[in-house]
From Swiss-Prot:
This is Ribonuclease P protein component. Keywords: Endonuclease, Hydrolase, Nuclease, RNA-binding, tRNA processing. SUPFAM superfamilies: Ribosomal protein S5 domain 2-like (SSF54211). It comes from Carboxydothermus hydrogenoformans (strain ATCC BAA-161 / DSM 6008 / Z-2901). It catalyses: Endonucleolytic cleavage of RNA, removing 5'-extranucleotides from tRNA precursor.
């Protein structure tokens, strides 16, 4: 089974921010950009603002979000790179709420891409 890829380079994040599209919900802002290889699994980046809290809180949030992305990796459209930015309202929610909100944002993105 293939694993999801996570972005690691600053240039990758910058490229998605500058050239990609964004969609927002109550819990997330997601930037997405079509990559060169349409068959490739999606790549994810997670950016947690210092407004969320101190490092311990941000890292816990990042770990929970990363696990949710691993579980839902195949729900995302292949051939796209994503940067996910959790909002402050996301901080103390249960894992099931995180999964539910990610599925909701995936649905919004698919609808947005189909309309474009």
């Amino acid at each position: 089974m293939n694993k999801c890829r996570f972005l690691s380079k600053n240039e990758e994040y910058r490229n998605i921010y500058q050239n990609g599209r964004s969609i927002a919900s109550r819990y997330f802002v997601v930037y997405y950009l079509k990559n060169e290889d349409e068959k490739k699994l999606p790549s994810f980046g997670i950016s947690v603002s210092k407004k969320i809290g101190k490092a311990v809180v941000r890292n816990r949030l990042r770990r929970r979000l990363k696990e949710a992305l691993k579980r839902l990796c195949f729900e995302f459209l292949p051939g796209y790179d994503y940067v996910i930015i959790p909002r402050l309202s996301f901080k103390n929610d249960e894992f099931s709420v995180i999964l539910e909100q990610l599925l909701y944002i995936i649905k919004l993105m698919k609808r947005s891409i189909d309309n474009a």
